[in-house]
Amino acid sequence: AGEECDCGSPANPCCDAATCKLRPGAQCADGLCCDQCRFIKKGKICRRARGDNPDDRCTGQSADCPRNRFH
């Protein structure tokens, strides 16, 4: 418990593999809405929708790509 990121790889520049905590200044370590240890800005498409549904977009507050309510 208490892990902030996946400490499997010491090569991840966002995550301290020894402590499983984000490195100083990092907001995230991975995820569809994480780029270079930072949350991707709100509104960026993170998952293209199928059919007539709207695309899923980053919130700017999380590394996760939220599913829109039509999925």
UniProtKB/Swiss-Prot annotation:
Chain ranges of the Disintegrin domain: 1-71
Cysteines engaged in disulfide bonds, as pairs: C5-C20, C7-C15, C14-C37, C28-C34, C33-C58, C46-C65
Superkingdom classification of source: Eukaryota
Subcellular location(s) of the protein: Secreted
Keyword check for Metal-binding: no
A GO MF label: toxin activity
SUPFAM superfamilies recorded: Blood coagulation inhibitor (disintegrin)
One Pfam match: Disintegrin
Motif Cell attachment site positions after renumbering to this chain: 50-52
GO cellular component annotations of the record: extracellular region; plasma membrane
Region (Disordered): 50-71
Gene3D superfamilies tied to this protein: Disintegrin domain
Keyword terms: Cell adhesion impairing toxin, Disulfide bond, Hemostasis impairing toxin, Platelet aggregation inhibiting toxin, Secreted, Toxin
Misc: The disintegrin belongs to the medium disintegrin subfamily.
Family of the protein in this entry: Belongs to the venom metalloproteinase (M12B) family. P-II subfamily. P-IIa sub-subfamily.
Subunit field text: Monomer (disintegrin).
Listed PANTHER family: ADAM A DISINTEGRIN AND METALLOPROTEASE DOMAIN (PTHR11905), DISINTEGRIN AND METALLOPROTEINASE DOMAIN-CONTAINING PROTEIN 28 (PTHR11905:SF32)
Role played: Inhibits fibrinogen interaction with platelets. Acts by binding to alpha-IIb/beta-3 (ITGA2B/ITGB3) on the platelet surface and inhibits aggregation induced by ADP, thrombin, platelet-activating factor and collagen.
Annotated protein name in UniProt: Disintegrin viridin
